[in-house]
Amino acid sequence: AALVFALDDLERVGQPYWGAYGIAQHGLAAMVGMLHAELASSSVRVSALQPGPMRTGLRSRAYADDNDLQAREAADYADACVTLLSSAGAAHRGQVWKVRA
């Protein structure tokens, strides 16, 4: 079994004006480490995926003038998600996998 969490870029959301969202993301990152330690002797793998910028409906509403050419379609990160959920995800156990599609 695998628990996989999605994380934003912690360095970016740790900056001024990110408020509750930034705090929540840092808390989630801490929880990944805690759960990994608590479940280390079990068959449950804990990891997180930190994708790069994604083109989503939420992003287009939050950043109406966004011209980020590095932003990718969410589907571009599907293979990384499948990897973490499969037995191959054992290589990333307890880690935050920073993926750039």
Predicted regions and their residues:
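Residue-level recognition of the N-termini of beta-strands and the immediately preceding loop/turn
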Residues: 1-2, 44-46, 94-95
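Catalytic loop of short-chain dehydrogenase/reductase
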Residues: 1-41, 53
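Hydrophobic structural elements of the Rossmann-like NAD(P)H-binding subdomain
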Residues: 4, 46-49, 59
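Short aromatic-enriched loop/helix-cap "lid" or pocket-rim segments at secondary-structure transitions
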Residues: 17-18, 58-61
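Short, local alpha-helical segments
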Residues: 41-42, 61-65
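C-terminal helical subdomain
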Residues: 48-49, 56, 64-101
